[in-house]
């Protein structure tokens, strides 16, 4: 859309039929056919903006990124599969936890997976993520600190056979564009990141895992 003397990426948020007197309305220059924001993301941005007392525009900017996401041609294929993955076996407690999570199926539910350090909680939600990905849906794993993403990267690769998409503030603009396109096209199905990853334009988000949910790093007070 025209914005002053420059062109910017805009989003049609809602329709209005009323006429505005003494105000010149500019036309949309071009519609980007390939990308659209689904209603669930629109509703989430509205809620997020109200809850955090920020303007929807600022929240939307975090979600859609800059115009390079739309005008630059980039291969959005990220997953690099390997043939040999490690085999893991669940114990009885892990099986019970996974059975409960699987019963939820496609319904909305909030579950707490609690256990001591080293009890195998990660393996349980890995198994749950695998079922979500097998259904052609996306899974998001949130981590409280950026430095934890590299530690988790190898563990994910050992289990799933491919590297997850890693999202946080230190990622280069080019890699962010690759991930953004892959996520909105549902080509990237496993995303690991800091809290800002919540605003990515997921096409078919089926599961969110908040690892170390009690960690104060998820909160921002300033």
What is each PLM-predicted segment?
Residues 1-194, 198-222:
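Accessory, non-ATPase domains that flank or precede helicase/AAA+ motor cores in DNA-metabolism machines
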């Amino acid at each position: 859309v025209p914005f002053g003397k420059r062109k910017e990426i805009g989003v049609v948020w809602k329709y209005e039929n009323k006429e505005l007197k003494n105000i010149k309305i500019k036309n949309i220059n071009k519609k980007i056919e390939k990308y659209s924001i689904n209603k669930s993301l629109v509703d989430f941005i509205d809620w997020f903006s109200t809850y955090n007392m920020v303007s929807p525009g600022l929240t939307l900017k975090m979600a859609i990124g800059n115009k390079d996401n739309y005008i630059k041609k980039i291969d959005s294929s990220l997953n690099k599969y390997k043939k040999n993955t490690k085999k893991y076996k669940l114990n009885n407690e892990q099986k019970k936890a996974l059975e409960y999570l699987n019963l939820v199926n496609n319904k909305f539910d909030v579950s707490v997976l609690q256990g001591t350090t080293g009890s195998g909680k990660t393996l349980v939600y890995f198994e749950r993520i695998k079922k979500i990905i097998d259904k052609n849906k996306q899974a998001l794993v949130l981590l409280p600190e950026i430095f934890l993403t590299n530690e988790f990267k190898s563990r994910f690769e050992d289990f799933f056979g491919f590297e997850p998409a890693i999202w946080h503030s230190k990622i280069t603009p080019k890699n962010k564009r690759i991930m953004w396109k892959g996520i909105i096209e549902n080509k990237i199905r496993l995303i690991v990141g800091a809290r800002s990853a919540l605003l990515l334009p997921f096409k078919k988000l089926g599961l969110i895992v908040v690892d170390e949910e009690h960690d104060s790093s998820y909160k921002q007070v300033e």
